[in-house]
C-alpha cells in the first residue's frame, strides 16, 4: 500500500530538485488531466507533482519494465529523465525503466463506458472487478455506441463506438462459437453492423457474455477472500513490509549518493574524527 511506505515520499522530495515546473507543464498526460478535471484555474500541488511521485514509485523498486497504457507513456519518459539526471549529477544508483505496452491497439487507451474519456474511477465511467454480474450487464447495456444508429436497418459507424472498441480489446475467435455462432469472426460482425441490419442490443449482449466470462474467475476468487478479511489485511501487510524493505534500501543508496546519509556514513565520520583529532 503506497501510503504505508514513507520512503516513497522522501524519494519524491529529493527528485523534485531534478525537475522544472516548465517540464511538468509540458507533460501531455498532466495537461490532459488538468483539462479533464477542470484544474486550469487552480492546480493542486500534489496533483501537479504526481509524475515525480510516480517516478519514486517506479525507481524505489528498481523496476526495469513498467506495463502501461498509451496515456501513461509520458510519465515513463519523465521517470527516465529523472533517472538520467540523478545518475549524472550524483552516481549510477537508479535504474532507467522501459515501458511495456500492449500489442492490441484497442488496449492502449480503453475508453470509459460513456465514450468520453479513458476509464477512470474518479469519472465514474468504469467497469470494476468487484462489480456484480447484474452491475456489469447494466453498464454494458448503457454503453455509448453510434448516436446515428437509431434503427436496426441503419448503417452503423465503428469509429468512436465504445462497444466495438471493447470487442477489439477482449473478443477472441472462440467467443463466436460460444455466444454468436452466426458469425465466424469480428470482421464479419463489423461488416454487418456497418452495412445495416444489426442492432446495438445484440452486439452489447455479445460483449456482455465476453466480459462476464473474463470476470467470473476474478469474482469467484474475490468471494473466497471476502470470507476471511483478516487474512486479506495480513497479505497486504506482508506485501507492504516487503516493499518497504526494498524502498528503504533504494532510499539509502540515493542518500548515500547525495552525501546526505550523515549518521550512516562511516567514512565521513572517520574523516571528521581525523580532521579534528588533537584540536
How does the language model describe each region?
Residues 1-115:
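Divalent-metal (Mg2+/Mn2+/Ca2+)-assisted nucleotide/phosphate chemistry catalytic cores
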Residues 80-279:
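Conserved nucleotide- and phosphate/pyrophosphate-binding catalytic cores
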Amino acid at each position: 500500500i503506497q501510503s504505508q511506505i514513507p520512503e516513497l515520499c522522501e524519494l519524491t522530495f529529493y527528485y523534485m530538485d531534478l525537475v522544472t515546473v516548465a517540464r511538468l507543464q509540458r507533460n501531455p498526460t498532466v495537461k490532459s488531466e488538468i483539462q479533464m478535471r477542470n484544474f486550469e484555474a487552480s492546480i493542486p500541488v500534489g496533483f501537479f507533482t504526481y509524475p515525480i511521485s510516480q517516478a519514486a514509485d517506479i525507481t524505489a523498486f528498481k523496476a526495469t519494465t513498467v506495463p502501461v497504457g498509451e496515456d501513461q507513456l509520458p510519465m515513463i519518459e519523465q521517470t527516465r529523465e529523472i533517472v538520467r539526471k540523478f545518475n549524472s549529477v550524483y552516481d549510477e544508483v537508479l535504474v532507467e525503466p522501459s515501458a511495456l505496452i500492449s500489442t492490441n491497439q484497442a488496449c492502449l487507451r480503453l475508453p470509459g463506458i460513456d465514450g468520453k474519456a479513458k476509464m477512470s474511477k474518479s469519472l465514474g465511467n468504469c467497469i470494476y472487478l468487484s462489480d456484480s454480474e447484474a452491475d456489469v450487464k447494466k453498464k454494458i447495456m448503457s454503453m455509448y455506441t453510434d448516436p446515428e444508429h437509431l434503427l436496426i436497418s441503419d448503417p452503423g459507424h465503428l469509429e468512436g463506438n465504445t462497444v466495438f472498441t471493447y470487442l477489439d480489446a477482449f473478443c477472441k475467435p472462440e467467443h463466436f462459437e460460444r455466444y454468436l455462432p452466426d458469425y465466424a469472426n469480428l470482421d464479419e460482425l463489423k461488416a454487418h453492423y456497418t452495412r445495416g441490419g444489426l442492432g446495438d442490443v445484440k452486439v452489447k449482449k455479445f460483449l456482455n457474455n465476453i466480459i462476464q466470462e473474463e470476470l467470473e474467475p476474478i469474482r469467484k476468487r474475490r468471494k473466497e477472500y471476502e470470507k476471511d478479511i483478516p487474512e486479506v489485511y495480513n497479505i497486504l501487510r506482508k506485501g507492504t513490509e516487503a516493499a518497504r524493505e526494498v524502498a528503504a534500501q533504494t532510499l539509502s543508496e540515493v542518500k548515500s549518493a547525495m552525501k546526505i546519509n550523515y549518521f550512516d556514513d562511516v567514512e565521513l565520520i572517520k574523516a571528521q574524527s581525523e580532521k579534528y583529532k588533537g584540536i
